[in-house]
Amino acid sequence: MTNKYVQYGCGLSAPKEWINFDVSPTLRIQKLPILGAVLKSSLSTSFPKNVQYGDIIKGLPVGDNSCDGLYCSHTLEHLSLEDFRIALENSFKILKKGGIFRCIVPDIEHLARKYISQLDSGNSVASISFIEDTLMGIKQRPKGLKGFIKSYYGNSHHLWMWDHKSLAEELKNAGFTQIRKCRYNDSEDDMFKYVEDESRFKNAVAIECRK
């Protein structure tokens, strides 16, 4: 039986050894017969051909208890708290017993400590820098139809931020075990070496856990 490794929220990082999913509207347009080819040159991003459209919140088109490994990097922070918990529930469902889940999100503790340090040093725009760093603020309300469409379909803003303790607790509540901080390429399963990018671990919460 062939082992199955799934990455969701893959963006443009789609190693051939993994099954890669993304929920970008651009990808959905790109996958449309004829129209996708016509509009390809006008799209802001062109996804690799092996990226499939799939939404972890609605459920990925893979069987329950079927995945040996699961990976997501800088994806979960783009979800509301409710959707985040649904994503963890669905992640747990598709993993095999003993399967490994590795996830990475920006570390709000790091950003908060940076903010306090700047504030204590007298930086008068420390709060602005903090909100910019978290990607949670809105500098300007969307205007016109183009702005509305970009705001509605875009997914660049962060909706919920995490530190290690809070993310580990959520994983525990979702049923995961053997929860630990992880580092780049420190998994005992070598398949994760194909999908991980060292730069994504910088100033981030990185956790490995098992079903």
Tell what function each PLM region has.
Residues 3-113, 165, 207-211:
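Conserved SAM-binding loop
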Residues 82-92, 96, 100-210:
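S-adenosyl-L-methionine-dependent methyltransferase catalytic module, highlighting the catalytic core
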